[in-house]
Amino acid sequence: MSDRRPIATLPDLLISQIAAGEVIERPASVLKEILENAIDAGARAIEVRLEGGGIRRIAVTDDGSGIPPEELPLALTRHATSKIRSLDELESVASMGFRGEALASIASVADLTIISRTRGAEHAWQIDGGSLQVSPASGPPGTTIDVRQLFDRVPARRKFLRSEATEFGHCVDAMERIALAHPEVAFRLFHHDRAQRQWLPADHGQRIRDVLGAEFVDHVLPVQAAAGAIALMGMVTRPTAARARADRQYLYVNGRFVRDRTVSHALRSAYADVLHGDRQPAYVLYLDIDPGAVDVNVHPAKHEVRFRDSGAVHRFVSQVVGQTLAQTGGAEAVPAGVPDGAAPDAAYAGEPAAAAPGLAEPRAPYPAAYPSPGQSPYQGSPARPHTQVPFRLHGEPAGIPATDWQSLYRPLPGDAAPAATALRAAPATPLPTADEHPLGQALAQLHGIYILAQNSRGLVLVDMHAAHERVVYEQLKRALDDRALPRQDLLVPVVFHAAEKDVALVEEHETQLNELGFEMRPSGPASIAVRSVPALLARGDIESLARAVLRDLGAVGVSRLLTEQRNELLSTMACHGSVRANRRLTLEEMNALLRQMEITERADQCNHGRPTWVQWSVNDLDKLFLRGQ
């Protein structure tokens, strides 16, 4: 056995190098810390110069307030800061930095020089991170921080750095995140003295366009809402513009870029019904909340936060984004007054227009699925009786009679008998305007699968099964939302072993569990008894269901498992209950489906995230036939 080593205080340099291991991971980490200091100093113009991807040099110049010469040595001292003075200030901190560790940590693993000049000073002052000697220097008002030879003093850390190109890419990412949070600040980036990026002061929308490009902005929906002390604004992509990678997801809490699982879970919930496969939404969201309601002192790099009431934040974000996505269909699907050539370069030219900022006004009472028997979708058209047999469930959910479910399926009006293959001449009616009928008027059915329609912009092609599937699905969801959630009492409670933290969750979230349809009680210090569950899920694995709900509650403070399970069931029902391919529809039936799509939320995608319709403008069609060329 080796001899015991006595306890000793570590040298300051080693302490700073250990701290640097938590904060300084690569050149991009250095750049982030320096940029945040510049923002806190009130800078309105920041210039960044890199060499070797930031490995050899990172120089950041700002026009902020500067540092007085007598405070320069303190700037390189650990835990010295101008941002906070007490615990109360820490708990409500609004600045980007507050720990007082960044510059000291950087100086311990690289050569660092600071040149700073306060406003009104005759000249600038300079300090070297090694000698800590302060000397006169020349320079404009503001601060320049020059970092060279990163990790030369810690060779083991330098071995983990990637190529110059890779590290430069990370530096660009770090700068983009800061630039998106502060559009009022001008940024310039040089690499080996070559200009790489330049962003002028702008509003949030223009800065997002400047940083992420028109390809991103042309396919987004604006988000803006507030409730009490919490507000959310920004942009989220339309479902049809979702990406294969989660690489364009920017969340800012009180101006600070963070990665938060509560908000991420809320966004996934909002997109649950409209994303296809494993596609990922892109977004730039700014969440403003009372600084006292969020803890930013979770990680030295300040990439994580902790909300005091994570459940409330989750519900707010999920509801706001969900309502934004819901309003993309219907009357806003094809904007009026858009030039023919203005269709975006998206996967589908018929993507919906951006909804107006803010929460949409409540819609009118939800209409019946289709016009009642004997009623035509267009006034003046002959009424036809319907003969479609209602869809029947093979096995209805426990606790809900089959007749209740079947009543949710309203048949298409009109005779279901196959129509003549020849296109009948439709009555001469004026072409509806975009305001009246955005999806236009049906012309014909193609291969028993698609509906061809004409609107004020051009040609609309609708996948009738996918469209009807979404309509029926939304009707089913709304019908269930309007009724009390049935609960199934268990004859014999299901008791299972659980960790102490899960037992505590049951006690803490008793009210929320009851609202979800669960009755759970601790049956001992390490066991839980389930006495009742939602009737929809009564035939499932009760223990696995309970554990999954508790896992969600422990992770993000809320559980959407019941909603997800319910929606999965309703999606299957809607798929089987919607009009099938190769069914011949009359023009009245086609128009009835188009009208129903226009008033149905999320009608642009089916339940599986696939598009339900696409738009070709007259200009698009002219190009196909080389007209006007």
UniProtKB/Swiss-Prot annotation:
<dbReference type="InterPro" id="IPR037198">
    <property type="entry name" value="MutL_C_sf"/>
</dbReference>
<dbReference type="GO" id="GO:0032300">
    <property type="term" value="C:mismatch repair complex"/>
</dbReference>
<dbReference type="GO" id="GO:0140664">
    <property type="term" value="F:ATP-dependent DNA damage sensor activity"/>
</dbReference>
<dbReference type="InterPro" id="IPR042121">
    <property type="entry name" value="MutL_C_regsub"/>
</dbReference>
<keyword id="KW-0234">DNA repair</keyword>
<feature type="region of interest" description="Disordered">
    <location>
        <begin position="364"/>
        <end position="388"/>
    </location>
</feature>
<dbReference type="InterPro" id="IPR020568">
    <property type="entry name" value="Ribosomal_Su5_D2-typ_SF"/>
</dbReference>
<dbReference type="GO" id="GO:0005524">
    <property type="term" value="F:ATP binding"/>
</dbReference>
<dbReference type="InterPro" id="IPR014721">
    <property type="entry name" value="Ribsml_uS5_D2-typ_fold_subgr"/>
</dbReference>
<dbReference type="Pfam" id="PF01119">
    <property type="entry name" value="DNA_mis_repair"/>
</dbReference>
<dbReference type="GO" id="GO:0006298">
    <property type="term" value="P:mismatch repair"/>
</dbReference>
<dbReference type="InterPro" id="IPR014762">
    <property type="entry name" value="DNA_mismatch_repair_CS"/>
</dbReference>
<dbReference type="InterPro" id="IPR014790">
    <property type="entry name" value="MutL_C"/>
</dbReference>
<dbReference type="GO" id="GO:0030983">
    <property type="term" value="F:mismatched DNA binding"/>
</dbReference>
<dbReference type="InterPro" id="IPR002099">
    <property type="entry name" value="MutL/Mlh/PMS"/>
</dbReference>
<dbReference type="InterPro" id="IPR042120">
    <property type="entry name" value="MutL_C_dimsub"/>
</dbReference>
<dbReference type="InterPro" id="IPR036890">
    <property type="entry name" value="HATPase_C_sf"/>
</dbReference>
<keyword id="KW-0227">DNA damage</keyword>
<dbReference type="InterPro" id="IPR038973">
    <property type="entry name" value="MutL/Mlh/Pms-like"/>
</dbReference>
<dbReference type="InterPro" id="IPR013507">
    <property type="entry name" value="DNA_mismatch_S5_2-like"/>
</dbReference>
<protein>
    <recommendedName>
        <fullName>DNA mismatch repair protein MutL</fullName>
    </recommendedName>
</protein>
<feature type="compositionally biased region" description="Low complexity">
    <location>
        <begin position="371"/>
        <end position="382"/>
    </location>
</feature>
<comment type="similarity">
    <text>Belongs to the DNA mismatch repair MutL/HexB family.</text>
</comment>
<dbReference type="Pfam" id="PF08676">
    <property type="entry name" value="MutL_C"/>
</dbReference>
<dbReference type="InterPro" id="IPR020667">
    <property type="entry name" value="DNA_mismatch_repair_MutL"/>
</dbReference>
<dbReference type="GO" id="GO:0016887">
    <property type="term" value="F:ATP hydrolysis activity"/>
</dbReference>
<comment type="function">
    <text>This protein is involved in the repair of mismatches in DNA. It is required for dam-dependent methyl-directed DNA mismatch repair. May act as a 'molecular matchmaker', a protein that promotes the formation of a stable complex between two or more DNA-binding proteins in an ATP-dependent manner without itself being part of a final effector complex.</text>
</comment>
<dbReference type="Pfam" id="PF13589">
    <property type="entry name" value="HATPase_c_3"/>
</dbReference>
